[in-house]
UniProtKB/Swiss-Prot annotation:
The keyword Transcription applies. This is DNA-directed RNA polymerase subunit omega. InterPro entries: DNA-dir_RNA_pol_omega (IPR003716), Pol_omega/Rpo6/RPB6 (IPR006110), RPB6/omega-like_sf (IPR036161). The lineage of its organism: Bacteria, Bacillati, Bacillota, Bacilli, Bacillales. Its EC number is 2.7.7.6. The keyword Transcription applies. Keywords: DNA-directed RNA polymerase, Nucleotidyltransferase, Transcription, Transferase. Belongs to the RNA polymerase subunit omega family. One of its GO terms (cellular component) is DNA-directed RNA polymerase complex. The gene is rpoZ. Disulfide bonds: none annotated. One of its GO terms (biological process) is DNA-templated transcription.
Length: 69
């Protein structure tokens, strides 16, 4: 079973699309050499580490609302 589960992540971030997008961007940063923000990640893969960061609250999401008018 994967940790954290999608159900657990959706308690804090309701949109699956947002979870995937943010995790992918953060995983790319980790893969490019940035250190994971979780002290002892359970996953050794960047995507798993990014999801753990989202679940623990170590990675925040900034919503940029643009007016398309």
């Amino acid at each position: 079973m994967l940790y954290p589960s999608i159900d657990a992540l959706q308690r804090t971030i309701p949109s699956k699309y947002t979870i995937v997008t943010v995790a992918a961007k953060r995983a790319r940063q980790i893969q490019d050499g940035k250190a994971p923000k979780v002290a002892e990640p359970k996953s050794y893969k960047p995507v798993g580490q990014a999801l753990e960061e989202l679940f623990s609250g170590d990675t925040t999401i900034i919503v940029n609302e643009k007016n398309n008018g």
